[in-house]
């Protein structure tokens, strides 16, 4: 199963990149890692309020200001690993940010997880937009 999202942001690619890789910026809209996301590094992200480990994986690709991808695992997925990829494109007035979350468990039994992740990405991206547009 694959989820895809796309949003437009009134921000430069470098500002959007910071929101995807910098722990303090990630904490605003997503979950906070222990260190900046960098190619080849393992990562863990924690709830900003709970402090609980929520997701983990490895940064596969980090081409600054253009493309970021990492493996993505959360507790409800068990041992399954998916991949999150971000692509940043210049557009007049800002940046188009595209998300592809692929390799999610398929089938009727896993559809509840897909629905939760779909809504979660919508909520997270709305927070990113709100924060970037307020800056």
Task: Please annotate each region the language model reported.
Residues 1-14, 115:
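Short, low-complexity N-terminal intrinsically disordered segments enriched in polar/charged residues
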Residues 3-5, 15, 21-56:
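Short beta-edge strand/loop motif at the mouth of beta-sheet-based domains
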Residues 13, 41-42, 66-67, 94-96:
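Structural motif
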Residues 13, 20-23, 118, 125:
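Short amphipathic alpha-helical/adjacent loop interface patches that line ligand
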Residues 16, 26, 59, 68-70, ...:
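Hydrophobic pocket/interface hotspot
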Residues 20, 30, 72, 132:
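Short, flexible helix/strand-to-coil boundary loops that buttress conserved ligand/catalytic motifs
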Residues 35-36, 49-93, 102-105:
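Hydrophobic-ligand binding "helix-grip"
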Residues 103-135:
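A conserved amphipathic terminal alpha-helix motif
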């Amino acid at each position: 199963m694959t989820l895809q999202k796309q949003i437009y942001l009134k921000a430069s690619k470098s500002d959007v990149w910071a929101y995807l890789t910098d722990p303090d910026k990630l904490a605003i809209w997503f979950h906070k890692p222990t260190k900046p996301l960098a190619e080849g590094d393992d990562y863990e992200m924690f709830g900003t309020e709970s402090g609980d480990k929520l997701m983990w994986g490895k940064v596969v690709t980090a081409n600054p200001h253009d493309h970021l991808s990492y493996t993505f695992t959360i507790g409800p997925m068990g041992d399954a690993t998916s991949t999150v990829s971000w692509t940043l494109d210049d557009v007049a007035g800002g940046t188009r940010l595209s998300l592809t979350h692929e390799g999610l468990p398929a089938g009727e039994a896993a559809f509840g997880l897909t629905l939760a992740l779909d809504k979660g990405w919508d909520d997270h991206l709305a927070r990113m937009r709100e924060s970037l547009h307020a800056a």
